[in-house]
């Protein structure tokens, strides 16, 4: 049987910022204790497509949110505010987790977590936007075709917390900086895809035409293209 000291040692991360290497062991705290679920309501008349969030417009793979296509036909919806972390609780494996940067309303199948400490918002967001958390939710999910996470189980999710708030903030800042780089790279990739799509349209003859609109200099006098079978 492991001693308490052995368990404490196991709660020290392998990689740690130099100034925190002697700060002591981390501990696990239930999610409910640091970011409880909130059940506040807001009138639908105060919500628009821009600030309404449902399981449909939270994007997969921690991709953020899109503008909602429609609003529900109800009087009120769940309320969230900037700094909350939202989880689409239908088919959790789709990884629809979003850290809110504005206030609004959410559908009933979206869980709203509110960090008790406003300085811990980023940290909680990174904990929930993590495959380990998603695997945990799926392990306790109920249903086959449309599995839902078990709310009581989710509340008990063990969140690793360092002994000093400053370490928690530095970890969150580091991960957020990486997210920004990833986001910029994703935009570059999307831009390149659009550029390639445009080139494809220019480098091949359009329907009903025999020469492309854009041609390499050495082939501009090579004549018209024709159709042949490949292989």
Region locations from a protein language model:
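DNA target-recognition domains and sequence-specific DNA-contacting regions of bacterial/archaeal
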Residues: 2, 32-161, 231
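Extended intrinsically disordered, low-complexity coil regions enriched in Ser, Thr, Gly, Ala
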Residues: 182-197, 204-210
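Short, recurring structural edge motifs at helix starts
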Residues: 2-4, 15-20, 142-146, 155-163, ...
């Amino acid at each position: 049987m492991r001693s308490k000291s052995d368990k404490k040692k196991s709660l020290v991360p392998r990689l740690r910022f130099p100034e925190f290497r002697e700060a002591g062991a981390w501990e696990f705290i239930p999610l409910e204790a640091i970011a409880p679920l909130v059940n506040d309501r807001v009138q639908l008349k105060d919500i628009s497509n821009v600030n309404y969030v449902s399981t449909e417009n939270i994007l997969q793979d921690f991709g953020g949110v899109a503008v909602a296509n429609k609003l529900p036909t109800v009087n009120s919806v769940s309320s969230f505010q900037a700094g909350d972390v939202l989880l689409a609780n239908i088919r959790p494996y789709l990884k629809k987790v979003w850290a809110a940067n504005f206030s609004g309303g959410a559908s009933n199948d979206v869980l709203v977590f509110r960090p008790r400490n406003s300085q811990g918002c980023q940290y909680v967001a990174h904990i929930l936007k993590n495959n380990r958390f998603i695997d945990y939710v799926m392990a306790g999910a109920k249903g086959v075709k449309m599995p839902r996470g078990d709310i009581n189980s989710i509340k008990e999710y063990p969140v690793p917390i360092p002994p000093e708030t400053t370490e928690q903030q530095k970890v969150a800042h580091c991960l957020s900086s990486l997210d920004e780089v990833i986001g910029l790279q994703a935009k570059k990739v999307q831009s390149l895809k659009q550029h390639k799509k445009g080139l494809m349209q220019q480098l091949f003859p359009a329907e009903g035409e025999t020469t492309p609109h854009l041609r390499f200099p050495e082939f501009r006098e090579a004549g018209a293209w024709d159709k042949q079978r490949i292989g």
